[in-house]
């Protein structure tokens, strides 16, 4: 269409130029009007063109059906060893096993001689026990009850240092928890010629709440002197035993002798 319009314009221009120059149409311009022909036959199929650019991503399709279960895979590598579990509860005792075979016959016993030897050994043990008790009482200065042993340490120390000294010997500061033990300790320091010693009672953790050196609470027994404990000057958190058997709260930084206590099972 555009080509036809261009040819018609060219023909019109030639006519104008011819009129201006007063020349004949044949002399001025020779015009040929081209008319489009009929549509030709379809040509042969051309070669395959180059691949086009990728198109836009289409919309997400619907979720497909679940596929068939695959075959079991091979055994994988061993994983790392996990943490050790907590200890389980103790199991029930097993059934009693069958009796074992009888042993070989023993050597005939000469019982009369053995009984005599055992009797002599019992006498020696009794004698040695009495001698040991005498040595502990007379030489080492130890006092005993059925369950406890007490040692008077004639070294002046502050309360906490005295407690450490007793612990270093395998015991603790003495803790009289009944009248008998308290009377024994009072007689002990009287015989030693002392007026007072540290014992294992204090209220270091909470004022007025006296406990024993092993932190067990005091029960019903106590031997406080009249007007004690009074926490004079707000610094009396430790306890002394005087020769009369009474207790008095004193400052822990004072130095004095002290009594250690030991369990017989651990001596």
Swiss-Prot record:
Biased composition (Basic and acidic residues): 41-50, 62-71
Superkingdom of the organism of origin: Eukaryota
PROSITE patterns xref list: C_TYPE_LECTIN_1, C_TYPE_LECTIN_2
Subcellular localization(s) per the UniProt record: Secreted
Binding site for Ca(2+) 3: 207, 234, 237
Chain segments carrying region Disordered: 40-109
GO BP terms: antimicrobial humoral response; complement activation, lectin pathway; developmental process; positive regulation of opsonization; proteolysis
UniProt binding sites for Ca(2+) 1: 203, 207, 231, 236-237
Coiled-coil region(s): 110-144
Signal peptide coordinates: 1-21
Gene Ontology CC: one annotated term: collagen trimer
Keywords: Calcium, Coiled coil, Collagen, Developmental protein, Disulfide bond, Immunity, Innate immunity, Lectin, Mannose-binding, Metal-binding, Secreted, Signal
Ligand binding (a carbohydrate): 196, 236, 240, 248-250
Positions contributing to Ca(2+) 2 binding: 228, 230, 236, 248-249
Record's function text: Lectin that plays a role in innate immunity, apoptosis and embryogenesis. Calcium-dependent lectin that binds self and non-self glycoproteins presenting high mannose oligosaccharides with at least one terminal alpha-1,2-linked mannose epitope. Primarily recognizes the terminal disaccharide of the glycan. Also recognizes a subset of fucosylated glycans and lipopolysaccharides. Plays a role in innate immunity through its ability to bind non-self sugars presented by microorganisms and to activate the complement through the recruitment of MAPS1.
Quaternary organization: Homotrimer; disulfide-linked. Interacts with MASP1; probably triggers the lectin pathway of complement.
Protein name: Collectin-11
Organism the protein comes from: Bos taurus (Bovine)
Lineage of the organism: Eukaryota, Metazoa, Chordata, Craniata, Vertebrata
